[in-house]
Amino acid sequence: MRVLGIDPGIALTGYGIIESKNGSEFKVIDYGRIETSSSLKKSMRLLHLYTELCSIISLYQPDVVAIEELFFSKNSKTAITIGEARGVIILTCIQNNLSIYEYTPLQVKQSITGYGRADKTQIQKMVKSLLGLSEIPKPDDVADALAVAMCHILSSSSVLYQEDEV
């Protein structure tokens, strides 16, 4: 199974492509970020996100997409903007006939570290360790995208797994 993990954002969207044959061993295919300039109109930023994601999907041919669920408590403007980016991401995946699975930050933390209240540093160290990377992927959004992809692989291989496709 090849999973495209995504940590959505308008300024920066992290992505990571991971492959697993048995649900416990991981092979990193690629990871990186899609950046948009704040000097562009929002519509142009969303278009850039769309075209870059289309290229990534075309190049790496993932089987499924795992995306981090939106969680904000205070800044509604940020939540709306990220919601718009998520909409573009979900539409792009649907247009490419990809199944999409969402995971909360709590689910990702629990899956990767075994502790639902793990902090960013703990998650990043586990991502580095589990993927056999020489350094922690930067920026944080990229490490988060890899963590979401691993979360899907680990969750889907669990006997407790319940399919929760978007």
Curated annotation (Swiss-Prot):
GO terms for biological process: DNA recombination; DNA repair. It comes from the Bacteria. It catalyses: Endonucleolytic cleavage at a junction such as a reciprocal single-stranded crossover between two homologous DNA duplexes (Holliday junction). Keywords: Cytoplasm, DNA damage, DNA recombination, DNA repair, DNA-binding, Endonuclease, Hydrolase, Magnesium, Metal-binding, Nuclease. PROSITE patterns: RUVC (PS01321). The keyword Membrane does not apply. The keyword Isomerase does not apply. Mg(2+) 2 binds at E68. It is found in: Cytoplasm. The active site is at D7, E68, D141. Binds 2 Mg(2+) ion per subunit. Its main location: cytoplasm. Its cofactor is Mg(2+). The RuvA-RuvB-RuvC complex processes Holliday junction (HJ) DNA during genetic recombination and DNA repair. Endonuclease that resolves HJ intermediates. Cleaves cruciform DNA by making single-stranded nicks across the HJ at symmetrical positions within the homologous arms, yielding a 5'-phosphate and a 3'-hydroxyl group; requires a central core of homology in the junction. The consensus cleavage sequence is 5'-(A/T)TT(C/G)-3'. Cleavage occurs on the 3'-side of the TT dinucleotide at the point of strand exchange. PANTHER family: CROSSOVER JUNCTION ENDODEOXYRIBONUCLEASE RUVC. This is Crossover junction endodeoxyribonuclease RuvC. It comes from Caldicellulosiruptor saccharolyticus (strain ATCC 43494 / DSM 8903 / Tp8T 6331).
